[in-house]
Amino acid sequence: MKQYLDLCNRIVNEGEWVSNERTGKRCLTVINADLTYDVSKGEFPLVTTRKSYWKSAIAEIIGYLRGYDNAADFRALGTKTWDANANENEVWLNSPYRKGEDDMGLCYGAIGRNFPKPDGGHIDLLKQIIDDLSRGVDNRGEILTFYHPGAFHMACLRPCMYSHHFSLLGDTLYLNSTQRSCDVPLGLNFNMVQVYVLLAIVAQITGKKPGKAFHKIVNAHIYEDQLELMRDVQLKREPYPLPTLKINPEIKSLKDIETWVTMDDFEIEGYQFHEPIAYPFSV
């Protein structure tokens, strides 16, 4: 929790104003932030200085692992995080690639589970990684990427957290996740949860011990209409101790994640939090 608050304070105190063309808003911005989550010690990085809707965050990462490309599928899992980008983004609404209501296009898991090859075929990057790790193989390129510049125009949004690189040392699994852009007040509390859960659940289904997850953010920012709430409300609150996350031990394979896992398979213990804060969202 301290590293999260340190980043928020750094942006407030040291950030520079940058105009964002896509949203038409200014952002207080810093470049490069590195966060670490020790999954082996159960240090679940859930924000306590406001209520965090952690089930929605986990539902989103599970949707990515399933390769979902439709906001309705994410809603069925338990999150509405894609409703606005799929249905309110003017550029996407006018795109010839949009298939209709709730369509997200080729982004995130839809790319990672079906990555286009130059010869016309596709690679299931996630399955390839799971197969390798289950056999104890680390080819130093176990990378789940959602980043495909040639497909940006075919999606409602470019991926923000776009790369997840798994590494093995003995039987301990590590993760390096890279994020090009982060809406810190709204997005980071979700992203921290997702990086932690991704390492924890991949370690579980491949029979490895989870180690540390390293989370790099390149452009970390607070939108101008979020600044007052962050500076004068959230940063004035005292954080509570971190809670712990329990994952159903019966989840043992990628097929389990794809077919029957629900948010009931995840449990939080000891979560104390302050009142929610309704930060504005920029489409």
Curated annotation (Swiss-Prot):
It is an enzyme of class 2 (transferase). It holds the Pfam family Thymidylat_synt. It comes from the Bacteria. Keywords: Cytoplasm, Methyltransferase, Nucleotide biosynthesis, Transferase. The active site is at 160 (nucleophile). One of its GO terms (biological process) is dTTP biosynthetic process. Its EC number is 2.1.1.45. (6R)-5,10-methylene-5,6,7,8-tetrahydrofolate binds at residues 183, 282. DUMP binds at residues 22, 180-183, 191, 221-223. The keyword Manganese does not apply. It is found in: Cytoplasm. GO terms for molecular function: thymidylate synthase activity. The keyword Transferase applies. GO terms for cellular component: cytosol. InterPro entries: Thymidate_synth/dCMP_Mease, Thymidate_synth/dCMP_Mease_dom, Thymidate_synth/dCMP_Mease_sf, Thymidylate_synthase, Thymidylate_synthase_AS. It catalyses: dUMP + (6R)-5,10-methylene-5,6,7,8-tetrahydrofolate = 7,8-dihydrofolate + dTMP. Pathway: Pyrimidine metabolism; dTTP biosynthesis. Homodimer. Belongs to the thymidylate synthase family. Bacterial-type ThyA subfamily. NCBIfam families: PRK01827.1-4, thym_sym. Catalyzes the reductive methylation of 2'-deoxyuridine-5'-monophosphate (dUMP) to 2'-deoxythymidine-5'-monophosphate (dTMP) while utilizing 5,10-methylenetetrahydrofolate (mTHF) as the methyl donor and reductant in the reaction, yielding dihydrofolate (DHF) as a by-product. This enzymatic reaction provides an intracellular de novo source of dTMP, an essential precursor for DNA biosynthesis. PANTHER family: THYMIDYLATE SYNTHASE, THYMIDYLATE SYNTHASE 1. This is Thymidylate synthase. It comes from Marinomonas sp. (strain MWYL1). The lineage of its organism: Bacteria, Pseudomonadati, Pseudomonadota, Gammaproteobacteria, Oceanospirillales.
